[in-house]
């Protein structure tokens, strides 16, 4: 399974994440890999940037579409075979209906080479996204692997500092044996940045976050120099993971 390989270029994919506005809703991540039709997906990304209502459906509460970084996942060079959609749903019924009947998502599925579906249960959330918290939940860590989402809006006058440290962050997480997958994603080039990573356990993530020297340097720089105008950090249990070819 590519999710458990530390080199994301082995299978770069389109991610589709769902998370709710209340504690009753369900959360998913779907990743789609494109060997062909990359230009088509790139055009869809561009169309969505200027028309946020392009992808819509009943039961859909929140949606974001991202491009991704190539190579180790944190490169400024785009990975044209990988895109990310983040959404929230009222419940599984609406999500299944969307997957089965929505014309755009069906075309994405049909044009993609493979898809990975992950059901997640967020339990540790700090910060906000465009002024709201779309990951409200009252869960707790269940003892298994976890998926972490980080997101930040980089201040324009801090871009050089941020970009200078991007490669250091990639090397740092790549060298940590607790990380099984990591990928940098972006809503807007450079300005709106996020990451998705999978860890063997919460403790392995904590070991990296609070003990890795390079990571701590970056965190301290970001706080001291106030790189971000908004941040979000989410820890999630992984409830299920399925791959479709």
What does each model-found stretch correspond to?
Residues 2-3:
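Tryptophan (W) side chains
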Residues 9-83, 92-98, 109-194, 204-211, ...:
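Short S/T/G/P-rich N-terminal loop/turn motif that feeds into the first structured element of a domain
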